[in-house]
Amino acid sequence: MESVVVKISGSLVHPPRLDYLTRLRDVLWGLVDGGFRVAVVVGGGGLARSYIDVLRRAGVSEALLDEMGIESSRLNASLLAKLLYPRSQPYPLASLREVLEVFMTGLIPVSGGFQPGQSTNAVAAVIAEALGARTLLNCLKGVEGVYSDEPSTPGARLLRRLTYRQLEDILVKVSSQRAGSYTLWDMVALSVARRSGLRIVFFDCSDPANIWGALKGEKGSIVEG
């Protein structure tokens, strides 16, 4: 059975919308029914950013802001894990070891962040590497894939296929490594993906059915090689 890791933007989970979340649940269950072994990682999204913004303006350290982001992502992950139950554990997992233990039982492991200084994108890449997954699906909200520049920049082009090096060049231009700001991908996650030869698909998951299209290479941007 092929393993696949699904990284879900926290902005897709919070604020929670029942119709969307049940459709997302059904697609994830459908992947399992279709013969895939699935692991899920959920980001902190707007929930994390709102908390982090207040704390940063209050002068709180980046290390503690990272902790706030982790806790926010785990709350989002807890929501999805409970929704996926009984085909998932009903609580967020907090380490690679816990993910592997749940995965070996045949359930869908659901996690948020693991540790300060590590984005949920990096968590997803590490999990994919550990599970031997070939593909990592990065579910975005309202963004079709990877663009040549910030999507709002005039002249920015959607790139359907690109290499790790091309993604790295784009990240240098558009990414910040501050807590709560891993909007596309980050260098730690990229280094893990590169060393393990992951195929990453960035795509708009405003419609959960797009997960199937991304898995087939019909949606979004594919990064590999």
Swiss-Prot record:
It comes from the Archaea. Its EC number is 2.7.4.22. Keywords: ATP-binding, Cytoplasm, Kinase, Nucleotide-binding, Pyrimidine biosynthesis, Transferase. It catalyses: UMP + ATP = UDP + ADP. Pathway: Pyrimidine metabolism; CTP biosynthesis via de novo pathway; UDP from UMP (UMPK route): step 1/1. Coiled coil: none annotated. Pfam families: AA_kinase. The keyword Magnesium does not apply. It is found in: Cytoplasm. The keyword Transferase applies. One of its GO terms (biological process) is UDP biosynthetic process. One of its GO terms (molecular function) is UMP kinase activity. GO terms for cellular component: cytoplasm. It is an enzyme of class 2 (transferase). Homohexamer. Belongs to the UMP kinase family. This is Uridylate kinase. It comes from Aeropyrum pernix (strain ATCC 700893 / DSM 11879 / JCM 9820 / NBRC 100138 / K1).
